[in-house]
């Protein structure tokens, strides 16, 4: 019988008195649980992505809300069948979102609920801004959204400068969204610094919108930073039509893989036929490379980890290189 698991997404922007103590307490708690996670904590808050066996997930949520610094945290919950991270990772990270510049987060955009967001989308009065990376919005986004061609979070400040030149900040209302809401905490503050007067941010991000409104005005799937890679935003509506195309044959597809060629590891969209033909690789050239990790349809599109280099160390194509390394 399969276990029931929860996927949790949550964050808190606010002072944390002793982040290193919180990290140690998290690690101690997780020793007795069937969980996996990627959690970052600093003096400015916490950014968490977590999966765990349902009773353990419920125990963790109750425990975290009892911690003085995190009592106001809101969890976004999805039902899953297994853990979706390779391990338990709880780390200190000075920047919860790697923006690359300082921003006054005491001045933020107006948080609006999924219901308010949906109404404003129907009004069609605001510039709807997707503040995620280009590989994220490629497989899913809101209707009529502006889609910045950026590859990392750190590129957004320069994009904000261009946006302020292309649109009159005093007269252009902006509605921004991201996956779970945390990036908008910084990006909305940045747009306000650039002179935009009317900035709204989707409270809880696309995840919260999907949980509350279903598919609504969303098209495609939501990119996520875990073993699922992508998910429909509405659990009740899993059969979502792809809006992207296979990078090899251009047929409709929304499945991401990372290239089986160890020396490439490129993130790319591919259909079932092409991924099988190219042995999990992003190109014919990569499929002929010397260091290819074992790919099979059964493993699906889960990201490769270091342990996937070869089935056994004796078969490792880089073993000879390792033996020649100086001690």
Swiss-Prot record:
UniProt keyword annotations, A-Z: Oxidoreductase, tRNA processing
Keyword tRNA processing included in the entry's annotation: yes
GO molecular function, one term: oxidoreductase activity, acting on paired donors, with incorporation or reduction of molecular oxygen
Pfam families: Rhodanese, Rhodanese_C, UPF0176_N
Superkingdom of the source species: Bacteria
GO biological process: tRNA modification
NCBIfam families: PRK00142.1-2 (NF001134), PRK00142.1-3 (NF001135)
Protein name: tRNA uridine(34) hydroxylase
């Amino acid at each position: 019988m399969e276990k029931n698991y929860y996927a949790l997404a949550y964050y808190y922007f606010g002072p944390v008195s002793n982040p290193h103590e919180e990290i140690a307490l998290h690690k101690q708690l997780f020793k007795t649980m069937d969980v996996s996670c990627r959690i970052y904590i600093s003096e400015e808050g916490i950014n968490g992505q977590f999966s765990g066996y349902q009773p353990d997930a419920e125990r963790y949520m109750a425990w975290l809300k009892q911690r003085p610094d995190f009592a106001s945290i809101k969890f976004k919950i999805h039902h899953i069948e297994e853990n979706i991270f390779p391990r338990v990772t709880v780390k200190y990270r000075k920047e919860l979102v790697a923006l690359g510049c300082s921003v006054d987060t005491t001045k933020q955009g107006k948080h609006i609920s999924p219901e308010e967001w949906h109404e404003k989308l129907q009004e069609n009065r605001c510039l709807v801004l997707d503040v995620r990376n280009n590989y994220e919005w490629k497989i899913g986004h809101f209707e009529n959204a502006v889609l910045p061609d950026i590859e990392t979070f750190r590129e957004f400040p320069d994009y904000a400068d261009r946006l302020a030149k292309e649109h009159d900040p005093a007269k252009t209302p902006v509605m921004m969204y991201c996956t779970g809401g945390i990036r908008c905490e910084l990006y909305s503050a940045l747009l306000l610094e650039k002179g935009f007067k009317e900035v709204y941010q989707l409270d809880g991000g696309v995840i919260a919108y999907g949980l509350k409104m279903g598919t609504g005005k969303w098209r495609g799937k939501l990119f996520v930073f875990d073993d699922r890679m992508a998910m429909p935003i509405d659990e009740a509506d899993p059969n979502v039509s792809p809006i992207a195309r296979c990078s090899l044959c251009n047929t409709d597809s929304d499945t991401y893989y990372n290239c089986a060629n160890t020396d490439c590891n490129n993130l790319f969209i591919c259909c079932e036929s092409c991924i099988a033909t190219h042995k999990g690789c992003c190109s014919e050239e990569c499929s002929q490379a010397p260091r290819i990790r074992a790919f099979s349809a059964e493993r699906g599109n889960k990201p490769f980890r270091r342990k996937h280099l070869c089935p056994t160390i004796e078969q490792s194509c880089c073993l000879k290189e390792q033996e020649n390394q100086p001690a």
